[in-house]
Each structure stands twice: as C-alpha cells, then as structure tokens.
Amino acid sequence: LGVTMLWICPMYKSPLADNGYDISDYYDMLEDYGTMEDVDALIAEAKKRNIGILMDLVINHTSDEHAWFQEALKDPNSKYRNYYIFKKGVDGHAPTNWRSVFGGSVWEKVGNEETYYFHAFAKKQPDLNWENPEMRKDIYKMINWWLDKGISGFRVDAINFIKKDQRWCD
C-alpha cells in the first residue's frame, strides 16, 4: 500500500467527554486502546516497516479530571492554579462576555469562590495557561517523553487557541 505514516487520534487516558480530546493523563493510555506496552510494540513494529507514528496532541486544554486541574481546584495556592486560567468575577458575573466554541460562556464558576476558570471548548476542558513558563516546561517534558519513546511527531489540535488576549476585554 505504500503506507509511510500512521496518524493516531487521541488515545491518551480520558473520561471521553469529547472523544478523547479531554486528556486526563498524557502518560497513560485509554484502556480501550490497550496498554503502554501495546504502544511500545506498535512503535517497534511500525519502525521495522519504515512506518512512522503521528499522534494527535491536545495542549490547549486538559480534562477537568487531569491531576493538575484537580489540584488547582482543591488548593487556590497550589502552583497548578496558575497552570490554568482563573479570574475573579466582576460584580457577580463572569470576567468577560466571551463565548465558547461549543456555546455558552467560556467561564465556569469555581464552587464557593468568586473565581471562574476559562474553557474555550466544553466546561470539562479547562484551558492551560500558556503564559506560565512552568506549565510550558511540563508540556515540553511530556512531548519529549513521547518522542523518546519513538513516535515520529504530532498533529497538534486547537493550536490556534493557546494564545489568549491578555486584556480580557468584552
């Protein structure tokens, strides 16, 4: 067939609120797709046949079940609070009038706080804060981990959403 590359949609651990585009663990696999040992075997067999592996990668947001986000919700003073975008409300309302891709506000209120978190897509997909160098470093570490495993590269999903207008104007 002349196949030179396999493009694999998200197969990372996910609660599947958005077909796997809500990743809860970048270093683990969704059970339906097998184990990390299966991934290693796939990479090895593909290499024998001169076939590369291209994986979908979502780095605009994670699942709200990701450990970073859970820690951010649990402890407002956690370093992970700054891994995401949290803003104080304005006069009892969301920080801006921005709308999400899936409809409704991009802001979701956090429990009993007067704080909201940002999600460009579904409320179960909180956006990462790309203004935070520590968060970027952890994402780069994960990317390199996969490259060291032997995949050929990534198709980066929703990359045009990672930069936000920091003025936060309506």
Language-model segments: residues:
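Acidic/aromatic-lined carbohydrate-recognition and catalytic surfaces
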Residues: 1-140, 144, 148, 159-170
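Receiver (REC) domain switch/active-site residues of two-component response regulators
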Residues: 152
